């Protein structure tokens, strides 16, 4: 799961709603979980750069 999310993040730090729904379905997670993961990941990215 994390690997898939990291790959997606590498290509695109911001998700469209449609992409978020696709990822949520593919990984059996809720849209909210995906949204929060990306928010957290962006904060981590910002901190590291």
Curated annotation (Swiss-Prot):
Residue ranges of the annotated DNA-binding region, renumbered to this chain: 1-49
A biological process from GO: anterior/posterior pattern specification
Places the protein is found: Nucleus
InterPro entries for this protein: Antp_homeobox, HD, HD_metazoa, Homeobox_CS, Homeodomain-like_sf
SUPFAM superfamilies assigned: Homeodomain-like
Example of a GO cellular component annotation carried by this entry: nucleus
UniProt protein name: Homeobox protein Hox-A5
Annotated organism of origin: Ovis aries
């Amino acid at each position: 799961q994390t690997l898939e999310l990291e790959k997606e993040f590498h290509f695109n730090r911001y998700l469209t709603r449609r992409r978020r729904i696709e990822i949520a379905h593919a990984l059996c997670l809720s849209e909210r979980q995906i949204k929060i993961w990306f928010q957290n990941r962006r904060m981590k990215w910002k901190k590291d750069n």
